[in-house]
Amino acid sequence: MTAQYIDGKAIAAQLRAEIKAEVASLREQGIVPKLAVILVGDDPASVVYARSKEKAAANLGIAFELFTLPGDTTEAALLALIERLNADAAVHGIMVELPLPKQISKEKVLEAIHPLKDVDGVHPLNRGYLMAGQPGLVPATPMSCMELLARSGVELAGKRVVIIGRGETVGKPLFFLLLRRNATVTVCHTRTKDLAAEVRRAEIVIAAAGKAGLVTGEMIAPDAVVIDAGINEGEDGNIVGDVKTAEAAERASLISPVPGGVGACTTALLFRNVLFGLKLQGGMAHE
């Protein structure tokens, strides 16, 4: 048996179409969703990411403004800009590109963004809302995992799910998202005594450890669903996930590849957060 591959690019296209339609509807009402992105310094990867978001925003009809600050910007100056954007009713989402220069505290900066404009979903209040089952903004990568499962017709209620990785932006949020869908969830991490045994018991495996090839084919239970949220540089310089995909595909029923799986949807979901944040700011949001 060979697994069916989940087409993340096709799902991303569906998401973009849905977002584009919602943006068009908002614009007809005179509401223009807007994302502000702050870039401090000239880190090449950050510049590329910022410009790719600008292009994606234009394709969706979402207004976009990039604030480029020099690398020697003070923490106080950056916090002052964030405060100004927090107070600007025309801005519905704020994102700060990472990494930041060493003179600036990442924690202070991310916590300074208004929770309802925190499209990365990393503010402590948004984490708390997720834990409490209340409407809030959730990081894009765990949302992408959930979208791949939902749009592939995978039932979660009562299923044994193993998450590999307990990071703040993927593993932990996924735990609460899956609980919300009535899954039975185990989180494995670096101190887990027998990872292979835990994974073999899972009907759904979500790998988010950031370690290339951590999950081998022999760990996967027959007919399990495998979602690979890992992004690593392989020995040949190409991007690979946490799962040995070809091996796992021999046993799984459904598997997401890297690239072309989870990562394909994250930018679209970032912009969906802009729209959800807009609704939260207007008191219109429902879970």
Swiss-Prot record:
GO BP of this protein: L-histidine biosynthetic process; methionine biosynthetic process; purine nucleotide biosynthetic process; tetrahydrofolate interconversion
Swiss-Prot/TrEMBL keywords: Amino-acid biosynthesis, Histidine biosynthesis, Hydrolase, Methionine biosynthesis, Multifunctional enzyme, NADP, One-carbon metabolism, Oxidoreductase, Purine biosynthesis
MF-aspect GO terms: methenyltetrahydrofolate cyclohydrolase activity; methylenetetrahydrofolate dehydrogenase (NADP+) activity
EC number: 1.5.1.5, 3.5.4.9
Reactions performed catalytically: (6R)-5,10-methylene-5,6,7,8-tetrahydrofolate + NADP(+) = (6R)-5,10-methenyltetrahydrofolate + NADPH; (6R)-5,10-methenyltetrahydrofolate + H2O = (6R)-10-formyltetrahydrofolate + H(+)
InterPro entries assigned to the protein according to its UniProt record, in alphabetical order: Aminoacid_DH-like_N_sf, NAD(P)-bd_dom_sf, THF_DH/CycHdrlase, THF_DH/CycHdrlase_cat_dom, THF_DH/CycHdrlase_NAD-bd_dom
Cellular component, GO annotation: cytosol
Pathway given in the UniProt record: One-carbon metabolism; tetrahydrofolate interconversion
Residues that hold NADP(+) according to the record: 165-167, 190, 231
Pfam family, any one: THF_DHG_CYH
The family this protein is said to belong to: Belongs to the tetrahydrofolate dehydrogenase/cyclohydrolase family.
Function according to Swiss-Prot or TrEMBL: Catalyzes the oxidation of 5,10-methylenetetrahydrofolate to 5,10-methenyltetrahydrofolate and then the hydrolysis of 5,10-methenyltetrahydrofolate to 10-formyltetrahydrofolate.
Assembly information from the UniProt record: Homodimer.
The protein's name in its UniProt record: Bifunctional protein FolD
Organism: Heliobacterium modesticaldum (strain ATCC 51547 / Ice1)
